């Protein structure tokens, strides 16, 4: 279970400023 991966997927659905810090895109 990769928390960062889940967050990145959620960001694709609902973008969030925090996503940019955690995820490459």
From Swiss-Prot:
The keyword Disulfide bond applies. It is found in: Target cell membrane; Secreted. Its main location: membrane. Coiled coil: none annotated. Disulfide bonds join 8-23, 11-19. GO terms for biological process: defense response to fungus; defense response to Gram-negative bacterium; defense response to Gram-positive bacterium; disruption of plasma membrane integrity in another organism; killing of cells of another organism. Keywords: Antibiotic, Antimicrobial, Disulfide bond, Fungicide, Membrane, Secreted, Target cell membrane, Target membrane. One of its GO terms (cellular component) is extracellular region. Antimicrobial peptide active against Gram-positive bacteria M.luteus (MIC=0.8 uM) and B.subtilis (MIC=1.5 uM). Less active against Gram-negative bacteria E.coli (MIC=32.5 uM) and yeast C.albicans (MIC=18.7 uM). Not active against S.aureus and P.aeruginosa. Has no hemolytic activity against human erythrocytes. Probably acts by disrupting membranes of target cells. This is Panurgine R.
């Amino acid at each position: 279970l990769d928390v960062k991966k889940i967050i990145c997927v959620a960001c694709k659905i609902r973008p969030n400023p925090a996503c940019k810090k955690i995820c490459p895109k």
